[in-house]
Design a protein with these regions (language model features):
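Hydrophobic alpha-helical transmembrane segments
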Residues: 1-155
Length: 155
């Protein structure tokens, strides 16, 4: 079935997580952070630029880990993993999409999730808001999935 080296998943996850922290917080520009959720092409372009930079940092981190640790990572699996992660990151960072998901979950299976997403003042302290917590947990969940995908096809 699927082959996987048991060291690939944790090493790739650690690389993706570290790169995510750097790319999402240090390398994202102020303009991207403030404008990526804006409607129209301006917001889409700012979000895309952020995700391209972030994905490049993640690709570099996975490559360094693979080379330094001599890990048998399938390049096609790694590329697929990075693409899936990039798409999920773009989707969430457009903001209205993640908020709509929280609202839908709040109406159907997780009462209060939409209200949680609106906790705090994003302009005063964006890292202390419900939206930020949901955003980052979404990203980390997809890092997990990406690390698993990158582990496939290795025997």
């Amino acid at each position: 079935m699927f082959g996987a080296d048991p060291l690939v998943f944790p090493a790739v996850f650690a690389a993706l997580y570290a790169a995510h922290e750097v790319g999402d917080h240090w390398l994202q520009t102020h303009g991207q952070a403030c404008g990526k959720g804006a409607p129209g092409w301006s917001g889409r372009l700012l979000c895309a630029r952020h995700v391209v930079t972030l994905t490049a940092v993640k690709a570099a981190a996975v490559t360094v880990v693979a080379v330094v640790l001599a890990l048998p990572i399938n390049p096609y699996a790694a590329a697929t993993a990075l693409a899936v992660d990039a798409i999920s990151h773009y989707w969430a960072d457009r903001r209205t999409t993640l908020l709509a998901l929280a609202d839908w979950l709040g109406r159907t299976v997780l009462p209060g999730k939409g209200e949680f997403a609106r906790l705090g003042d994003g302009s005063a302290a964006p890292t202390g808001t419900g939206a930020y917590a949901l955003d980052q947990s979404w990203h980390v969940g997809w890092l997990f999935a990406a690390a698993l995908l990158a582990s496939l096809g290795v025997a």
